[in-house]
């Protein structure tokens, strides 16, 4: 069975939908404290965890597509994903600099690693199609995650970060949709 970005993105969206009910989940119980002593709520903690998890995944998947993509458009998009996610991660780290650490993510690591491994073993138009389809699904799920943080997060710094970053995610989605349309 082939695990792809669609599977990972679906898990991300479904997990986000369950946040309000996850009061016994480790991430919900483990509230990180902000600099002011106000604890990060479960939504903020989940947001940080998922955003932190997405960065290495996007960088790794992007590097595979950058090296093996068959068109300049795919390679350019992959290069954008690598550089953009490194920049976004640096911005998130700056926001979190004076906050207590958030527990490391565990749920999706294996799924993301499997997806990157699948891409590494693909080539040609199959790799291009799977990478682009996965990007469309990932960017939709990522936009939903950021919108959820903006609407429901309690940490003002994280909400501002999400508000400033969401337009970039929407741009990434628009570019991925354009690549997908070009394949048809």
Describe each PLM feature range.
Residues 3-7, 19-184:
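His/Met- and acidic-residue-enriched segments that coordinate or traffic transition-metal cofactors
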Residues 10-14:
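Hydrophobic helical h-region of N-terminal Sec-dependent signal peptides
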